Amino acid sequence: MGQKVNPCIFRTGPNLPRNWESVLYAKNNYSDFLLKILKIRKIINTEYSFAQITKILIEWPSSKNIVVNIYAKKIGVIIGKSGGDIEKLKQNIAKITSADVSINIREVKKPELEEAFIAQTIAQQLERRQSFKKVMKKAIHASMKQGAKGIKIICSGRLGGVEIARSESYKEGRVPLQTIRADIRYAFAEAITTYGVIGVKVWVYRCDVNQSRINEVK
């Protein structure tokens, strides 16, 4: 019987398409560091949900210093007026970690290729009661237009408010899930609607790992 694995975990590691999103050094208190990292991610995703955050990278080289890199489409929402919101975020993270906090905000230039952005956008549009078919097709068209080699989207739940839940999927291009060298990004989001929760899954195939590394060198 076939077993499903998260495409991101399947491709994370040295010489693979993805790297770890959290890097820390710990001896016996690894679980404490992990719990604090989860709290930091929850604070950022909750307080700045409208910033359309695509990725959060956390580097914790020592107990005294922590670096948080936030990638988002609307960086102004995170920074706030005169940097007031980002200072507040630093204070909240410092309370959790008891360390010196450095925050780097980076703007995503092509959000249509970011799996998290696509999933969040679809979920928000479903909450506004837009047609799930139009929303999914529009997202696929925008992603392919920006250079994606393939994209697959699945929405599950009471689509359109029907009584019986079902799943609808749309796909364009190639999404080779069994090819490890393929740089496939995966994200999941939930749309909280009046008739229930709708799950949104997104797979985006960008390129092969060799091609992506050549582009990084350039």
Curated annotation (Swiss-Prot):
This is Small ribosomal subunit protein uS3. GO terms for cellular component: cytosolic small ribosomal subunit. Part of the 30S ribosomal subunit. Forms a tight complex with proteins S10 and S14. Belongs to the universal ribosomal protein uS3 family. Binds the lower part of the 30S subunit head. Binds mRNA in the 70S ribosome, positioning it for translation. The lineage of its organism: Bacteria, Pseudomonadati, Pseudomonadota, Alphaproteobacteria, Rickettsiales. InterPro entries: KH_dom-like_a/b, KH_dom_type_2, KH_sf_prok-type, Ribosomal_S3_C_sf, Ribosomal_uS3_bac-typ, Ribosomal_uS3_C. Keywords: Ribonucleoprotein, Ribosomal protein, RNA-binding, rRNA-binding. Residues 40-109 form the KH type-2 domain. Signal peptide: none annotated. SUPFAM superfamilies: Prokaryotic type KH domain (KH-domain type II), Ribosomal protein S3 C-terminal domain. One of its GO terms (molecular function) is structural constituent of ribosome. GO terms for biological process: translation. The keyword Cytoplasm does not apply. Gene3D superfamilies: 3.30.300.20, Ribosomal protein S3, C-terminal domain. It comes from Orientia tsutsugamushi (strain Boryong) (Rickettsia tsutsugamushi).
